[in-house]
């Protein structure tokens, strides 16, 4: 009876794993090589996708920050535009003031071009000349009030009376005139030339 129950046992491979067949060495090596080749491709594709997303995000950021319809202009261009406009207004006001000042200064010739430095120097000299004219008055017959006394300095307040005219220059000890160099005033020289022309004209008319 014991002999009747014994049966031939199937091979262990077919009994436990009937659908699994062992692989050969060539197939095993081929599967390993294909797996190793697929891994770098997947990594490269992931990197490309990340870089593309970064480029798209950067492009949207740049488009939003520009002064287009979808973005707002930056603060720096607006401040620069305001500063440039303020500087242009200041330059125009200064040029207008210098142009008005040039019209008040007599020059020879009348249409003489003056720089800003020359305009300021001539304006200062003309103010000093007019001050000497007020101080000396008609006492100076040669038309050169600036040569008859010291330069004029307006030290009093507005509306205060003018000081008395200065005395004539003293004589030197050797009996000659004072050896101090005379101040040259272009406006006095211009007046002197005008006086000489008037004398010549009157002399020509009389003769």
UniProtKB/Swiss-Prot annotation:
Pfam families: HLH (PF00010). GO terms for biological process: BMP signaling pathway; cartilage development; cell differentiation; cellular response to BMP stimulus; cellular response to cAMP; cellular response to follicle-stimulating hormone stimulus; cellular response to mechanical stimulus; cellular response to transforming growth factor beta stimulus. Residues 78-130 form the bHLH domain. One of its GO terms (molecular function) is RNA polymerase II cis-regulatory region sequence-specific DNA binding. One of its GO terms (cellular component) is transcription regulator complex. SUPFAM superfamilies: HLH, helix-loop-helix DNA-binding domain. Its main location: nucleus. It is found in: Nucleus. Expressed in mesenchymal precursors of cartilage and in connective tissue. Highly expressed in tendons in the limb, tongue and diaphragm and in cartilage of the bronchi. PROSITE patterns: BHLH. Efficient DNA binding requires dimerization with another bHLH protein. Dimerizes and binds the E-box consensus sequence with E12. Plays an early essential role in mesoderm formation, as well as a later role in formation of somite-derived chondrogenic lineages. This is Basic helix-loop-helix transcription factor scleraxis. It comes from Mus musculus (Mouse).
